[in-house]
Structure formats: C-alpha cells, structure tokens
C-alpha cells in the first residue's frame, strides 16, 4: 500500500575509427530511479490491517504521500583508446567515471509525539500492557481480574475500531496534523525549531579509474 516505483534506463555507445592505427570509443549508461519504501510491522498491526499494510504513507490534500522516498542515479561513462603501434605492438587505454547519487527521506521529530502510526504507544495493546507493566508477575498471576479493571476498555475499543475500520487519520501518517503542529509551534515560538521535519539523507560517491595495457609479440611464441 502507498508505494510507487518509477525508473528508466539508458545506454549510449559510439566508436570512431580515426585511421588504421587509432580508434576511440565512448559508452555511457544509467538508470534514474525514484521509489517509495515499505516496512515490516508487528503481528498486532498485521492482524488489524493485513499483510499489505505500510505505515510509511498518509494522505495530504487527498493525495497519497510517502515519508520514505528513495532517489538513486548512477551515471557511468567509459572511454577507450586503441592504438595499434605496429603489427606486433598494441596499446589499449581506458578511462571510467562513475557517480553514485543515493538519497532517502525519513520523518524526524523533536519534543513531539512520535508520528509513526504503528508506534507501540499508538496501538490498543499499549493501553493494556502499560497497566500490566505496573504490576509484578505474581500480582499478574493472582489478581488479573483486578488489574484488568484498571484498563480503560473504552479507549482500547475505540482504538481497535479505528484500526479495524481503517481510519487513515490513525492508521497512516497524518500529514495535516504534522503541518498544523509545526504551524502552532511557530506561532507560539517564532524563533524555535520545527516539531516535525522530513529529512533527506545522502550517500553520494564518485569514482574514477584509468588503466592502460601494452602488448607486444616478441616472437611467434611470446
């Protein structure tokens, strides 16, 4: 759910025979790609929403928007020069250039509620586990009915209903709520930082290579 994949590729190659002794060739290729990601979730969430559930997206102005988008582009250029020195001597020289541009986005938050819809505190089970966690194992074994009476069952039922009925304001990222939180925070504290940010992490790499191979047939055997 909420995923997309856009990619295309190209390959161009050309060779020029300058004369009987020299030739040059050039090749370039790449595959610009933009795609969204999905995530593994807990069994509780799978039970509510099924195996295709993906917590990384939500609606913004009626359109699906993913918080995890990968952009990748790895253009490569290879050039070769073939020099026939004599009938027995040859020099081949090659140059390669490769640039890897890889980035992926993710939500960040500061002094604010976790925006992930499947964060454990946002699930119905947390309302039960939070109460159980305040009692020891012996109390849980001997006084379970008393302990469970302290659980806000109405809240558990409400959250369960929202997940089962797929209230996307709860089950997916609530983009409008994030923007509203940032807006209100900016009104109250104009010099402060945003509560929520969409960061883009880059891992870029540039590589060049140069090699030259000389061959010479000394005699019929070498």
For each feature predicted by the language model, list its residue ranges.
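Residues on the lipid-exposed face of transmembrane beta-strands in outer-membrane beta-barrel proteins
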Residues: 12-16, 77-83, 93, 210-216
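Acidic/polar loop-and-plug regions of large Gram-negative outer-membrane beta-barrel proteins
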Residues: 15-17, 23-80, 103-199
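Outer-membrane beta-barrel channels and translocator barrels
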Residues: 17-21, 86-88, 219
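Transmembrane beta-barrel strands of outer-membrane/channel proteins
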Residues: 1, 10, 26-32, 95-97
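Residues that define the transmembrane beta-barrel architecture of outer-membrane proteins
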Residues: 4-8, 71-75, 204-208
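Outer-membrane beta-barrel transmembrane domain signature of Gram-negative proteins
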Residues: 183-188, 198-222
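Outer-membrane beta-barrel translocator/receptor signature
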Residues: 1-12, 18-22
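Transmembrane beta-strands of outer-membrane beta-barrel proteins
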Residues: 24-26, 91-95, 220-222
């Amino acid at each position: 759910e909420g995923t997309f994949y856009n990619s295309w590729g190209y390959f161009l190659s050309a060779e020029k025979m300058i004369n009987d002794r020299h030739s040059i060739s050039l090749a370039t290729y790449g595959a610009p790609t933009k795609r969204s990601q999905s995530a593994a979730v807990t069994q509780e969430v799978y039970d509510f929403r099924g195996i295709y559930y993906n917590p990384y997206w939500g609606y913004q102005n009626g359109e699906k928007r993913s918080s995890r988008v990968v952009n990748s582009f790895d253009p490569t250029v290879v050039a070769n020069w073939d020099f026939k020195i004599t009938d027995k001597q040859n020099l081949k020289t090659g140059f390669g250039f490769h640039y890897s541009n890889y980035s992926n986005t993710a939500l960040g938050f500061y002094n604010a509620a976790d925006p992930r819809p499947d964060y454990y505190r946002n699930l119905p089970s947390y309302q039960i586990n939070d109460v159980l966690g305040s009692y020891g194992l012996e109390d849980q074994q001997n006084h379970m009915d008393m302990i469970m009476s302290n659980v806000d069952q109405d809240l558990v039922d409400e959250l369960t209903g929202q997940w089962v009925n797929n209230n996307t304001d709860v089950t997916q990222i609530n983009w409008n709520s994030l923007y509203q939180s940032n807006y209100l925070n900016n009104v109250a504290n104009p010099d402060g930082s945003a509560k929520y940010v969409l960061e883009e992490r880059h891992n870029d790499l540039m590589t060049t290579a140069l090699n030259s191979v000389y061959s010479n047939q000394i005699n019929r055997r070498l």
